[in-house]
Design a protein with these regions (language model features):
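Conserved NTP-binding catalytic cores of kinases and kinase-like/nucleotidyltransferase enzymes
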Residues: 2-3, 9-143, 148, 265, ...
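Prokaryotic Sec-type signal peptides and long signal-anchor helices
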Residues: 7-8, 224
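Catalytic-loop Lys-Pro-X-Asn motif of eukaryotic-like protein kinases
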Residues: 256
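ATP-dependent phospho-/nucleotidyl transfer catalytic cores
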Residues: 88-95, 129-135, 142-252, 260-280
Length: 280
């Protein structure tokens, strides 16, 4: 299974991996933060070692997104959520990470029940980390079947192998999925401009500190202006979509890297679990 194009990757074939810092060092006077950083590095080293896994993979590859560590231990993938809080996402405690691992499992099984295998706890005792039930639960991972590289829709498109037939297969899969989702008044209210603006306004607020660094003031104000203009000019369209029950619990992050298309099967995976309103 691949992660998003933002991922960074490294691999190890045996023994203890050479670590690259994955968290900022804690400032002086913050021993608790430093302890968390040290624990994360030990956990990453454990999960990068092929000897750690019951099925003894030949190698382990680590891919990172901004919110997860993804360990590819063929034929399985183990995904661990980073302990962080970003406003729209909160993985800050072990219990919250357990909850969202379970949500990831449940939500993605709607579209690919054979890929998402279970939530696997990782234990820690005096002897270190283990998948065996020894000591206390230190972390949770989502265990998945690995998807064969070369068949992600982004890769097929780059090779010129996506035509009308392939697009129709994706459409048919999504149509069945949307038809299976029942309208829910509590979800449909999120189709109003007022509710949708919660997410876009939140995004603008979170981007403001980076104006002049990663986005120019003109670009920021232009995007915000046209976003708000679109809401104001299309209110009837938004309300019509609600009346026609078109607001459903969907995927939330549907792009080419999250569609896997072989001659035998189509797999749409990695929907958003950390914020329900992003899927509506």
């Amino acid at each position: 299974m691949a992660s998003s194009g933002q991922a960074r990757e490294r691999s190890t074939s045996s023994g203890r991996a050479r670590l690259r810092k994955c968290s900022r060092a804690a400032p002086p006077g913050a021993p608790q933060a430093q302890d968390q950083t040290d624990s994360q590095e030990r956990l990453i080293a454990f999960l990068e070692s092929p000897e750690s896994y019951p099925h003894s993979p030949a190698e382990v590859r680590l891919m990172q997104t901004h919110i997860s560590w993804v360990f590819i231990a063929s034929p399985f993938v183990f995904k661990v959520k980073k302990p962080m809080e970003l406003g729209f996402l909160d993985f800050s405690t072990l219990e919250k990470r357990r909850h969202f691992c379970q949500r990831e499992l449940e939500l993605n099984r709607r579209l690919c029940p054979d890929i998402y295998l279970g939530v696997v706890p990782i234990y820690e005792s005096a002897s270190g980390f283990s998948f065996n039930a020894e000591g206390e639960i230190a972390e949770y991972s989502v265990k998945m079947r690995q998807l064969q590289s070369g068949w992600f829709l982004s890769q097929l498109l780059a090779k010129g192998l996506v035509g009308e037939k392939e697009i129709k297969r994706v459409i048919c899969c999504l149509h069945r999925f949307y038809e299976s989702e029942k309208p829910d008044p509590e979800i449909e209210v999120w189709g109003t401009p007022e509710k949708l603006k919660i997410s876009t306004d939140e995004n603008f607020v979170q981007v403001e500190p980076f104006i002049g660094r990663t986005i120019s003031p003109v670009a920021f104000e232009t995007i915000r202006h046209f976003t708000n203009q679109f809401y104001a000019g299309n209110e009837e369209l938004f309300l019509e979509r609600i009346k026609e029950h078109r607001i459903l619990d969907c995927h939330g992050d549907l792009h080419l890297d999250h569609i896997h298309l072989t001659p035998e099967a189509i797999t749409i995976f990695d929907c958003i679990e950390f914020n329900d309103r992003f899927r509506f």
